[in-house]
Each structure stands twice: as structure tokens, then as C-alpha cells.
């Protein structure tokens, strides 16, 4: 599911495809370009991934702690908990990339990344994408179709649907692990596709197409839900002013989801999808491949940044989460401060009247 800049194709599941090492070998002797490329691979990328690794551990660790104290009252909260799990698993793959890119691992360390780590990274990235789509559908149903089929709103249905998502992603991912069974050597270790069996290579490409279609489907759902909610709120705000403020908050919530989705996932797929469904890579020269490699790595980094941006969704969209966070931090929300001030004033009034009645 990553770009492989040995590029015969834009394959899917190689997060740690050996584009950097292939590009290094082809760029040797090119002076400044080679030095810049080496610094990008061995210094800049490891530092960037180290930063988001530390940030993600802190943010998602806090999220796990808070969600542990929140009951599964709604399907929305349950979807958020699934995203936390996916983000944490995805985060745990970062150290492997950092070690590889910084040059600290042995040569056969590449095999671990090809067979396990890259598969886990992409499986959990697309799991997060699916749950973001489910959250947008949940917001649409709660705002536009609040009196629809009751089974769609039950927590049992949500749990079953969530299990189905994890099972499907496991079914797509496990063959990529099992069929990456080639004998690693110093000659083939830098190309993950050479470590796959013939069936593994075909499965890998099939999963690449499935994931690309999955992204497009979720993108369409997100945009469709956002437009539908916006239109409904605009239409109903003229009739029911008291209810529209609450529904406007739902609209702001889905805006956060759309913003995170577009920021993290759209750039990478704009870079990847044209190559997945065409033979554009055959038309590119070496300099174009190098530019594509930099674009791929930076847009892939943006996708990885999703693990740090998802906590923003928890904070702005989940009242239970923000309330629990403020409570644990001894910080009052604005509404709580107003209620507390009103309570104090009422107490002062009662004391005044009690005193004057004496």
C-alpha cells in the first residue's frame, strides 16, 4: 500500500518499501543530490517520525485512559474507541521505520518491516479511515434521520459492525504476512515484492486496488454526509431555532472529521491512486521518480500524522471525553463555570433573605 520507487507499479502494502535504498543506489555519484537524498532518508524522516511517535504515545495514551472511564453509551463513542486502538497499533510501527531509516538495524531487519510492520501500518490506517466514514454516517443519521430504524442506532449493531470491520481488515492483511515468505538475501532484501510468492504478489496488488476503492468510497460518504447535514440544518434553522443550535454543533463536528481526513489522507492518495490504476510510472525519468519519491514520503508522513490529529476529534466531538479531560485536569468548562456562578449567586440571595428576615 505504499509507493515503491523501484517503480514497476505503485504497490500497496509496502510502507517501508525500499524506495530510499533503491534511490540511494541510483543517485550515488550525483554529488549534492545524493547527499541531500541521504540526509532526507537518514535524518529528516527519522526525526519527523520520532516526533509524531512521542506525541501519539502521549495523546493516545491519555485518550485510552479517559475512554476507559467512559461507558459505551452511544455508537459514536464506540467508534472513537476503535479509532484509538487502530491509532495505537499504527503508532507502534513507527520505531521500526525509525531504526531502519537511521541505519541502526541489521540488513535482515528489512524482512521484518516488509512482512509485518508495513502490513500493520496500512491495515490500521485504513481501519481508521473506515471508522471515520462510519462516524460521518452516524452523525448523518442522528441529525437528518433521528427517527429511523432503531436497530441502526443500537450499541449492539455498532459492536457487530465494528467487529466486521476488524475481521475484514484482518482477512485482507493476513495473506500479505503469510505469503511474504521468500528467503531474504542481501540481493532481494531491498525490494519487498521479491520476498513475496507469486500468489502473494497478486494478493498484494488486489489489496492495493481494494484499499484505493475503500478510500474513494469513504471520501464520497464524508462529502455526501457533510453536504446533507449542512442543507438540513440550514433548512430547519428557520423553523426550529432552539433545535438548530444543537444540530449546528453536529455540523461543526463533522467539519472536524472532514478536515482531518482531507489533511491526512487525501494528499497521499492523490499521489498514489494515479499510479495504482495506470502505467504512468513507465513514462517517468529518473528525476521525476525522485520527485515522486519525496512526494510519496511526505504525503505518507501526513497520513501517519493522523494518529496525532484524531485526539482533536475526540476533544471537539465527544462531550464525555472533553468533560472527563477537564475534570481530571481540574479545569472547568464554560457551561460548568456559568452553572457554578449561578449557584453561588442563588446561595448569596438565600443568605441575604435569611438574614433580613431575622
From Swiss-Prot:
InterPro entries: GPCR_Rhodpsn (IPR000276), GPCR_Rhodpsn_7TM (IPR017452), P2Y13_rcpt (IPR008109). The keyword Glycoprotein applies. Residues 1-47, 97-116, 181-208, 278-297 are extracellular. Expressed at high levels in testis and brain and to a lesser extent placenta, ovary, prostate, and skeletal muscle but not in heart, lung, kidney, liver or intestine. It is found in: Cell membrane. The chain crosses the membrane at residues 48-68, 76-96, 117-137, 160-180, 209-229, 257-277, 298-318. One of its GO terms (cellular component) is plasma membrane. One of its GO terms (molecular function) is G protein-coupled purinergic nucleotide receptor activity. Keywords: Cell membrane, Disulfide bond, G-protein coupled receptor, Glycoprotein, Membrane, Receptor, Transducer, Transmembrane, Transmembrane helix. It is a multi-pass membrane protein. Disulfide bonds join 114-192. Glycans are attached at residues 4, 24, 33. Disruption phenotype: Tubule-specific Gpr87 deletion in mice ameliorates tubulointerstitial fibrosis induced by unilateral ureteral obstruction. Residues 69-75, 138-159, 230-256, 319-358 are cytoplasmic. PANTHER family: G-PROTEIN COUPLED RECEPTOR 87, P2Y PURINOCEPTOR-RELATED G-PROTEIN COUPLED RECEPTOR. Belongs to the G-protein coupled receptor 1 family. Receptor for lysophosphatidic acid (LPA). Necessary for p53/TP53-dependent survival in response to DNA damage. Promotes the Hippo-YAP signaling pathway and thereby modulates glycolysis and oxidative stress production by the regulation of hexokinase-2/HK2. This is G-protein coupled receptor 87. It comes from Mus musculus.
Amino acid at each position: 500500500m505504499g509507493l515503491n520507487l523501484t517503480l514497476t507499479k505503485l504497490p500497496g502494502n509496502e510502507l517501508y518499501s525500499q524506495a530510499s535504498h533503491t534511490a540511494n543506489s541510483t543517485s550515488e555519484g550525483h554529488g549534492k543530490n545524493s547527499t541531500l537524498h541521504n540526509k532526507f532518508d537518514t535524518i529528516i524522516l527519522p526525526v519527523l517520525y520520532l516526533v509524531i511517535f512521542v506525541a501519539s504515545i502521549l495523546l493516545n495514551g491519555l485518550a485510552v485512559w479517559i475512554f476507559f472511564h467512559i461507558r459505551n453509551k452511544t455508537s459514536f463513542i464506540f467508534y472513537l474507541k476503535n479509532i484509538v486502538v487502530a491509532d495505537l497499533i499504527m503508532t507502534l510501527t513507527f520505531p521500526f521505520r525509525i531504526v531502519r531509516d537511521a541505519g541502526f538495524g541489521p540488513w535482515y531487519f528489512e524482512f521484518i518491516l516488509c512482512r509485518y510492520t508495513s502490513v500493520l501500518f496500512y491495515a490500521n490506517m485504513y481501519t481508521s479511515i473506515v471508522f471515520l466514514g462510519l462516524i460521518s454516517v452516524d452523525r448523518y443519521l442522528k441529525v437528518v434521520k433521528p427517527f429511523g430504524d432503531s436497530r441502526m442506532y443500537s450499541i449492539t449493531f455498532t459492536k457487530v459492525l465494528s467487529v466486521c470491520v476488524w475481521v475484514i481488515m484482518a482477512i485482507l492483511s493476513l495473506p500479505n504476512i503469510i505469503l511474504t515468505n521468500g528467503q531474504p538475501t542481501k540481493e532481494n532484501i531491498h525490494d519487498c515484492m521479491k520476498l513475496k510468492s507469486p500468489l502473494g504478489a497478486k494478493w498484494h496488488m488486489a489489496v492495493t486496488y481494494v484499499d484505493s476503492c475503500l478510500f474513494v468510497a469513504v471520501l464520497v460518504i464524508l462529502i455526501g454526509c457533510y453536504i446533507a447535514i449542512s442543507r438540513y440544518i440550514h433548512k430547519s434553522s428557520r423553523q426550529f431555532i432552539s433545535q438548530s443550535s444543537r444540530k449546528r454543533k453536529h455540523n461543526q463536528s463533522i467539519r472536524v472529521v472532514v478536515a482531518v481526513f482531507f489533511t491526512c489522507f487525501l494528499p497521499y492518495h492523490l499521489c498514489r491512486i494515479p499510479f495504482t490504476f495506470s502505467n504512468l510510472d513507465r513514462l517517468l525519468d529518473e528525476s521525476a521518480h525522485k520527485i515522486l519519491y519525496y512526494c510519496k514520503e511526505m504525503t505518507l508522513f501526513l497520513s501517519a500524522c493522523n494518529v496525532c490529529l484524531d485526539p482533536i476529534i475526540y476533544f471537539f466531538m465527544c462531550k464525555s471525553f472533553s468533560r472527563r479531560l477537564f475534570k481530571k485536569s481540574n479545569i472547568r468548562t464554560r457551561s460548568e463555570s456559568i452553572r457554578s456562578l449561578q449557584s453561588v449567586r442563588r446561595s448569596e440571595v438565600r443568605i441575604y433573605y435569611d438574614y433580613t428576615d431575622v
